[in-house]
Amino acid sequence: SRAIIKIKKKYKNKIGIMCDVALDPYTSHGHDGLIDKKEILNDKTIQILIKQSLLQAQMGCDVIAPSDMMDGRIGEIRRALDKNGYEKIQILSYAVKYSSSFYGPFRDAVGSKKALKGDKKTYQMDFSNIDEALREVALDIREGADMVMVKPGLPYIDVIKEVKNKFKIPVLAYQVSGEYSLISNAIKNKILSNDAIYESLLSLIHI
């Protein structure tokens, strides 16, 4: 929140700020929601996500980006923002966030891999099921999402293309730590040239 204030004070509206909304950076167990008896408490988690979103909006965030994957959180956050006078704040939904092995290097870097108990397959997306992804995008748009994310990016270019063609809204792709590590390690071992980084990012843009 302090960073948002400082950036907005210095650059005014010359730069837009997107703010991630999730609980996993703050939970002792590494999950994106509150847990009771090994069960994710979806609705109670959403109430905290709403408070987080309102605080970020109050500080000057331009785009709220819920990455938690709780069911129904887009609609609840949209209603809370509108009710409190933040109608112009946009929502980027991590609508298609797969339960992916490609997050590994990031979790190692921030120390959440050791804290994480179990996996996130009960609330993140099944990467073998594209129909589920399309249904989730449609649902989040109905709830008020202004744009959607597909994460990871490169392994799911077909999903990005399908979402973009079907829904005609801004679609963002996230090149995650595992994707980048594959390429950077190949560069370090002189299997690929540095141009591979640029090529991998451009491939996500031109679709």
Which residues does each predicted region cover?
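Generic hydrophobic/aromatic pocket-lining and core-packing "Φ" positions
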Residues: I4, I46, S53, I74, ...
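Conserved small/polar residues in nucleotide/adenosyl-binding loops
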Residues: I205-I207
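Active-site beta->alpha loop and helix N-cap motifs at the rims of alpha/beta catalytic domains
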Residues: S1-Q52
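Active-site mouth loops of central-metabolism enzymes
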Residues: H29-I48, K113-L134, I183-Y198
